[in-house]
């Protein structure tokens, strides 16, 4: 099973491609963050997210995506911008016929860490240990959250040991 994990954001969109082998072993094929801070225009940011994710989808031939649901922020404008980034992310998936699974941030944390209130550091630790990565493995918190989204789908789709 190949899963495309997404952590959408207007300035930083994390992504990850995680493979679960039939044996149950997990591999991180690639991960990264699409940074749009150099774009001053909202439309440019959205196009950058869409085109960047579309290229990754094509490169890895992904057919399943796991994405964080929107959470309500105290700042309505921030929530609105997050929705724009999610829309660009969803459109990239839909335009390539990628099946989308959505999970709340709490569900992702609970599924991956066992606690829905896990910190970014705790999630990063579990992500590294689940994938057999060293403590030196470096990626952004956005990429870590995208990996966690992919792992959540894998763990929710059956036993992580392939039994």
UniProtKB/Swiss-Prot annotation:
Concerning InterPro entries, the annotation shows: RNaseH-like_sf, RNaseH_sf, X-over_junc_endoDNase_RuvC
Q: Which cofactor does it need?
A: Mg(2+)
Q: Which is a Gene Ontology cellular component entry for this protein? A: cytoplasm
| Example GO BP | DNA recombination
The record's subcellular locations are: Cytoplasm
> Which reactions appear under catalytic activity for this entry?
Endonucleolytic cleavage at a junction such as a reciprocal single-stranded crossover between two homologous DNA duplexes (Holliday junction)
What positions does the entry give for Mg(2+) 1 binding?
Answer: 7, 142
Q: What is its EC number?
A: 3.1.21.10
Answer yes or no on keyword Amino-acid biosynthesis. Answer: no
* Residues where Mg(2+) 2 binds: 68
Q: Which Pfam family is one of this chain's hits?
A: RuvC
Parts forming coiled coils = none
A molecular function annotated in GO for this UniProt entry is: crossover junction DNA endonuclease activity
Cofactor note as given = Binds 2 Mg(2+) ion per subunit.
Q: Which UniProt keywords apply?
A: Cytoplasm, DNA damage, DNA recombination, DNA repair, DNA-binding, Endonuclease, Hydrolase, Magnesium, Metal-binding, Nuclease
The catalytic site is made up of: 7, 68, 142
Q: Which NCBIfam families match?
A: ruvC
* Assembly with partners or alone: Homodimer which binds Holliday junction (HJ) DNA. The HJ becomes 2-fold symmetrical on binding to RuvC with unstacked arms; it has a different conformation from HJ DNA in complex with RuvA. In the full resolvosome a probable DNA-RuvA(4)-RuvB(12)-RuvC(2) complex forms which resolves the HJ.
Q: By its UniProt entry, which PANTHER family does this protein fall under? A: CROSSOVER JUNCTION ENDODEOXYRIBONUCLEASE RUVC
Instruction: State its role.
Output: The RuvA-RuvB-RuvC complex processes Holliday junction (HJ) DNA during genetic recombination and DNA repair. Endonuclease that resolves HJ intermediates. Cleaves cruciform DNA by making single-stranded nicks across the HJ at symmetrical positions within the homologous arms, yielding a 5'-phosphate and a 3'-hydroxyl group; requires a central core of homology in the junction. The consensus cleavage sequence is 5'-(A/T)TT(C/G)-3'. Cleavage occurs on the 3'-side of the TT dinucleotide at the point of strand exchange.
Instruction: Report the sequence similarity comment from the record.
Output: Belongs to the RuvC family.
Which protein are we looking at? Crossover junction endodeoxyribonuclease RuvC
In the record, what lineage is assigned to the organism producing the protein?
Answer: Bacteria, Pseudomonadati, Pseudomonadota, Alphaproteobacteria, Rickettsiales
């Amino acid at each position: 099973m190949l899963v495309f994990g997404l952590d959408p954001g207007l300035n930083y969109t994390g992504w990850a491609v995680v493979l679960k082998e039939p044996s149950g072993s997990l591999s991180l094929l690639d991960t990264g963050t699409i940074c749009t801070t150099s774009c001053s225009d909202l439309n440019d940011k959205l196009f950058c997210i869409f085109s960047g994710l579309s290229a990754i989808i094509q490169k890895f031939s992904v057919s399943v995506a796991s994405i964080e649901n929107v959470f309500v922020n105290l700042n309505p404008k921030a929530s609105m911008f997050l929705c724009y980034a999610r829309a660009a992310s969803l459109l990239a998936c839909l335009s390539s016929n990628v099946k989308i699974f959505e999970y709340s941030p709490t569900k992702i944390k609970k599924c991956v860490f066992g606690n829905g209130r896990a910190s970014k550091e705790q999630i990063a630790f579990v992500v590294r240990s689940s994938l057999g990565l060293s403590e030196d493995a470096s990626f952004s918190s956005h990429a870590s959250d995208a990996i966690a989204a992919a792992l959540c789908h894998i763990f929710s789709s059956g036993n992580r040991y392939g039994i």
